[in-house]
Structures are given as structure tokens and as C-alpha cells.
From Swiss-Prot:
Belongs to the UPF0502 family. InterPro entries: DUF480 (IPR007432), WH-like_DNA-bd_sf (IPR036388), WH_DNA-bd_sf (IPR036390). Gene3D superfamilies: Winged helix-like DNA-binding domain superfamily/Winged helix DNA-binding domain (1.10.10.10). This is UPF0502 protein PputGB1_3531.
Amino acid sequence: MSEHETAGEGRFNSIEIRVLGSLIEKQATSPESYPLTLNALVLACNQKTSREPVMNLTQGQVGQALRALEGQDLTRLQMGSRADRWEQRVDKALELVPAQLVLMGLMFLRGPQTLNELLTRSNRLHDFDDTEQIQHQLERLISRDLALHLPRQAGQREDRYTHALGDPAEIEAILAARQQEGGARSSGASVSEERIEALEARIAALEARLAELEG
């Protein structure tokens, strides 16, 4: 086990998040080539489609992330005669059902998304009937501090959801950027202070939990 006391309960950098999301996606969409070789995983991480933001990672960066995640039981190396391959173990480490794993994977790859975006983008990964099913699974993830609900900003029509496994500072940056974006679209409108306070309280709780794990 690494610096965190419990597998999967740590906070991860953007490269580790991209690695996990790519493994989850390819497990569902390319089962014939999964688990992935390091080279295939680098290509998956650097895809120019279905990735926000687009990244340009090296084999060294991806390999380092894999080793860090392996230390927390979130990835596993399968040694082969022709090539070593990597698989994700997020579902086992975090005790996720398939629907939750897919949603976490989508949020790992594309950040904050609306219910309708998650429904559309999950069509090759899982068979959700409607947005209500997605919202139900997201609420279960939120109750475990694995996901965040981001109330819609001024000029937006829908709330958004994102994972809560990134660095707390990065999560705060997402919230700040969304608030600024909303203000730019409608300078006369302001975000509900109660909603902001609720999000700030959740961030504080996440930071406190991280401090306990690192202690």
C-alpha cells in the first residue's frame, strides 16, 4: 500500500485520472485488445476525441502513473510472453457496480458533464434507459464522496457532475472556472451563495479526509 491507508481513497493527479479513465473505456469498447499494452494505453490517453482536455503524455509519464496506481490496487500488471499488459481495478478497489464504473470513467476522461451528456456518451459503454438511472447512480457516488454535483451557472441550462478523486486544488479550480464562465455569459447574474457555500463545504470535507489518510 502507498501513502494512503485505504486502496482507492486517495486523490490523484491529472495523468493518473486519464490513465484510469482510458483503461475503463477500452475495457468496454475494445475487449479484444484489453488489457492494454503500455503503448496502446499511451495512445488511448492521448486520443483527440472523447478527451477533455486533449493530452500529450509520454510512455514515461504513463508508466509512472501506472506504478503509482498499482501501489493502491487500482491497476494490475499482467506479464505476457509477447508483451506486458495493464488492467484497471477501480471497480474492485472502490466496490463499484458496472454502471457506476462507466460514469466514473466518463468523468475521468471529460470532467464535468450534464446528465444528458453522460447518457449520450455512455451509449457504447453501458445501457442506461434514461437520465434518471444515471442520476440515481451519481447520487450513490456522491454519497460516498466519489463524485460532485455542480449546480448550473448563469447562462447554463443544466447542472453538471464530476468525479471527486482529483487533487482538491484542481477541484476548486474547476468550480472557480465554472463560476467565472457563468459570470462571463451573464454579467448581471450571480450564482446562488448557498450553493457555493455547500460546494465549498464539500471541498473542505474532502481536504480534511485527504489529510487524515495522509496522516
